[in-house]
Amino acid sequence: HHAMRIKLRVWRQAGPDAQGRLEDHQLDDISPDMSFLEMLDVLNERLIKAGDEPIDFDSDCREGICGTCGLMIDGRAHGPLPGTTTCQLHMRTYADGDTIVIEPWRADAFPVLRDLSVDRTAFDRIIAAGGFISVNTGAAPDANAVLVPKADADLAMDAAACIACGACVAQCKNASAALFTGAKVSHLSLLPQGSPERARRALRMVQQMDAEGFGSCSNEGECEAVCPKQISIANIARMNREFTRASLGGAS
């Protein structure tokens, strides 16, 4: 493989309240086999050697499982490939001489910590508000004691695939967290183990979502288009149904 020349425009921001800017970098020795984040590692090593501050970005597993990474790449959350996280993107997706613009997730509820790293603890607080069950569901053999229809199990599994990366919020013009919250509400509302808190969960998680300052959902579908786990916006409809049902049922 020939080495690629890549020009980067990377967002730099010293802290949440600092003024940010795009900074240009030229890389001349990029292998097409490198992952996108390895390419940033190479740039950071160069910056450190030159005595400059490395670019802050989040990553952990680097195999599309954990939800830690997430970059806005040329205006698209997680980059150009469908159903993938940023860490699953490779430089062979790009051509020699390309310019790539890299920005953080942008949402009031996700303040920039530094450079490309944002604070997603708002998601944790939505989960804490209701994304749990209080009933002990037993050990593995007990799973067969409560029968779940295959169709319901499949829908619950599809919703539970969410890795809380925040791409849905970043891509949405309203910065709505409806797909994330909808996935979490759905996955428990579809299973019998989730039924004791069902009404309270829907109300509390939606209320927390609104309190965090996420925008409202206007059914654009941008979220589903960039979701690395390709979670359906049918989960948003299910959340709305759960919320309405809980509101009418007098839960609190």
Each predicted region: which residue ranges?
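Eukaryote-biased recognition of intrinsically disordered, low-complexity regulatory segments
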Residues: 4-25
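Short strand-turn-strand beta-turns centered on an Asx-Gly dipeptide
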Residues: 11, 28, 73-75
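Short, contiguous acidic and Ser/Thr-rich linear segments
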Residues: 23-35
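Ferredoxin-type iron-sulfur electron-transfer modules in oxidoreductases and energy-metabolism complexes
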Residues: 34-53, 100-252
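Short, structured protein-protein interaction patches enriched in aromatics and acidic/basic residues
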Residues: 56-68
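Glycine-rich phosphate/adenylate-binding loop and adjacent beta-alpha elements
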Residues: 73-95, 102
